[in-house]
Design a protein with these regions (language model features):
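Residue-level preference for the first positions of well-ordered beta-strands
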Residues: 63-67, 92-94, 137-140
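Pre-P-loop entry segment of helicase/translocase ATPase cores
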Residues: 2-57
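Well-ordered, non-membrane alpha-helical segments in soluble/globular domains
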Residues: 39-54, 81-82, 151-162
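Walker A/P-loop
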Residues: 62-80
Length: 173
């Protein structure tokens, strides 16, 4: 699964997720909800996941992309879900996934863990008015929607790009 996270801040001060809190929440979820066993190696991977996402939050204008390549089954998707559930309200995220079912699952999981509606998925089976997307903290879309919007944007035909890339009045990055 390919995941892209883009984050925008509405304040000039970085508001990242504390790594120790993230690892603790991830370990608790991993063991209690998923009934998996944790290990120091997994916790190290989870720390790196959080640090990578935090780097994007704290360096929003950095042109450098960081790629996460932990092994299969190490919690990349669950880490993304936990991280987004912990995001302060002032930070918006765009997540791009391959399949509509993944988009629905990720948005639903974020909301369930956060205990509030922070995330929505938008795709051909779950259309949400474009103007409502700007107030959505975590937007989950498919690769196809992202590619189509980017293609239309490049040809000045776009109606969705700004809605995908804007959270409140700031740009998602």
């Amino acid at each position: 699964m390919a995941l892209l996270i883009s984050i925008t801040k509405n304040l000039s001060k970085p508001m990242s997720v504390p790594v120790d809190c993230f690892v603790s929440n991830m370990k608790n979820y991993w063991q209690s909800s998923l009934k998996n066993t944790s290990s120091p190696e997994l916790e190290n991977i989870w720390s790196k996941i959080c640090e990578t996402f935090n780097h994007k939050v704290e360096n929003e204008f950095s042109p450098i992309w960081h790629v996460l390549q932990p092994p299969t089954g190490s919690g990349k998707t669950q880490g993304l879900v936990i991280y987004c559930s912990m995001l302060p309200e002032i930070i918006g995220a765009l997540i791009v996934v391959r399949f509509k079912e993944q988009a629905d699952m990720i948005a639903s999981s974020i909301n369930q863990i956060a205990g509030v509606k922070k995330a929505v998925s938008r795709h051909s089976d779950h259309l949400i008015p474009m103007e409502d997307l700007r107030d959505t903290q975590v937007l989950v879309i498919t690769h196809k929607a992202y590619e189509n919007s980017l293609d239309r944007f490049q040809h000045d035909l776009d109606w969705s790009w700004k809605n995908y890339t804007t959270y409140r009045k700031s740009k998602r990055r």
